[in-house]
């Protein structure tokens, strides 16, 4: 869990940030004669739904800190802490117990035994793509999105 937002007041909602950067990348490709810049989503990707949404919004890669920390082979043995946590005079993160859910292969490829988004990330991506009619990730990255605003309670 990162406390950067609370500590230094810097944060953009991840979906908005990914979509804005992907759009800026498209503009840059036009201006630079086709030079492609990778978009890597990092932060708040704790479940397969967030992973799928990041790709749908245009990310080329997704950092999966907490999900990978849940694998039984992970060195933290069910504990996760982001690199932002380490700072000499201004720590901004917390060591978090995320637990273990199974081997890395199960985290990535399943099977899932609960509908909590903690395992089978690739299966979730395949299901989302099939449900929306996409057969490849490149086109899925450009799918239309509808944002439904809500207020947290």
Predicted regions and their residues:
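Alpha/beta catalytic cores of nucleotide-metabolism and tRNA/nucleoside-modifying enzymes
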Residues: 8-41, 46-153
């Amino acid at each position: 869990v990162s406390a950067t937002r609370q500590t230094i007041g810097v944060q953009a909602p991840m979906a908005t940030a990914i979509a804005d950067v992907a759009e800026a990348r498209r503009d840059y490709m036009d201006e630079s004669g086709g030079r492609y810049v990778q978009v890597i989503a990092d932060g708040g990707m704790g479940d397969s739904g967030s992973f799928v949404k990041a790709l749908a919004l245009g990310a080329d890669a997704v950092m999966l800190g907490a999900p990978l920390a849940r694998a039984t082979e992970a060195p933290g043995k069910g504990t996760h802490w982001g690199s932002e946590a380490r700072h000499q005079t201004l720590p901004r993160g917390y060591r978090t117990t995320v637990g273990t859910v199974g081997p890395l292969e199960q985290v990535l490829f399943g099977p899932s035994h609960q509908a909590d988004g903690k395992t089978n990330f690739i299966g979730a991506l395949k299901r989302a793509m099939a449900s929306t009619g996409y057969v490849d990730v490149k086109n899925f990255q450009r799918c239309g999105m509808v944002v439904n605003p809500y207020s947290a309670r």
